[in-house]
């Protein structure tokens, strides 16, 4: 089933800091609200899911009196079979800019897709942060795929008797237990840097204006800020303690410029872009052991790298094209993952009308802490599975563990450290 995406106040801008700079505008019509049915998680239930998530989050500093509202922040997709606009997910914002949560509208998927304790998020923020359009699209694809995998897994279950119940699935009901956090690593990176002033104060002048630093330079600089290396480059000394405390330090702008030059930045006023393949060589020239080339996204590699105290660079594209069978990607963004937590719960499946457990399975969820390189905007925890549209949720089943064909070329550069070979 094809889906088309539209939402209120959104002009669909695709990635701007990319291998090839291209901004695409697509006309759209406002989507009117639809009646909520049992097919969808209601707004009221979405708020309850946020409150439950906070209650079970042992590290959360959120107070119980914080009020969340959804208002008109609803992302819709077009069902081309029914010609209806159906809700895909909601954005619940806390009072006074004290955080937000992205909640799936599908009752069959993980409720909380993303969670942050700072700032608010609006669909119209895509006008300033164009890469959000790509991210919202990813969420929709993940929800669709997770629906499919969850249905398959719940039928299969963990009991040898379960395949015999495939045709009798309506006669069973699931009763999930409470989530329990099993592991957490707090964010490694303390800075919240961006692409404009003061970070671009040493960038080239174009028509009297400073070029943007580019997301490649911002992500790379933030990873270096954690390792506090190199001690200097190209005649500029890096006092990391001062630079992390004071982003107006001239050394910060010089760091961004040095990185930009090394990755062969295509400087621009509206967007600066560089190829992701140039990132490993930049690290090597600035004193690091050369990281491997960008590799296919794997949440397990991201988590393993974070456990080794190595923040991970993540790259993605919003446009995939093909010419004579040759694929290529356009319009990209680069960001950082530097922390994570895992939680799990047991789900018991009962035959309707019986109190005896027929079979059980375990659901596991990993949330990655992401630093988007937007001066701290939208930094928070995001469900790890959304970055691979072909993967289902983390179930102990070969059916859900297969690697999918991710349409947006999401790649990672893990295990970045300062040890020279």
What label would you give each PLM region?
Residues 1-15:
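Sec-dependent bacterial lipoprotein signal peptides
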Residues 20, 115-121, 125-272:
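Active-site-adjacent structural segments surrounding the nucleophilic cysteine of cysteine proteases
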Residues 52-57, 106, 218-230, 285-286:
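Structured segments of extracytoplasmic/periplasmic soluble domains
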Residues 61-66, 229-240, 290-297:
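Surface-exposed patches in mature extracellular/periplasmic domains of secreted proteins
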Residues 78-97, 293-366, 371:
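Active-site-adjacent substructure of cysteine-protease-like catalytic cores
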Residues 213-217, 221-225, 251-341:
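Predominantly the structural core of cysteine protease catalytic domains
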